[in-house]
Curated annotation (Swiss-Prot):
UniProt lineage: Bacteria, Pseudomonadati, Pseudomonadota, Betaproteobacteria, Burkholderiales
Name recorded for this polypeptide: Large ribosomal subunit protein bL34
Top-level division of the source organism's lineage: Bacteria
GO molecular function, one term: structural constituent of ribosome
Family membership: Belongs to the bacterial ribosomal protein bL34 family.
Gene Ontology biological-process entries: translation
GO cellular component terms attached to this protein's record: ribonucleoprotein complex; ribosome
This protein's UniProt keywords: Ribonucleoprotein, Ribosomal protein
Length: 44
């Protein structure tokens, strides 16, 4: 059986990247929450 996680940098960035997060109101909320928490990496 094939494993579920087949890494791909392109797909990772396109689904969870910074630009994608900034597109929606909810995504911006995620970035702001991570900024407030002091996360080193805001998005993938």
């Amino acid at each position: 059986m094939k494993r579920t996680y087949q890494p791909s940098k392109t797909r990772r960035a396109r689904t969870h990247g910074f630009l994608v997060r900034m597109k929606t109101k909810g995504g911006r909320a995620v970035i702001n929450a991570r900024r407030a928490k002091g996360r080193k990496r805001l998005a993938v």
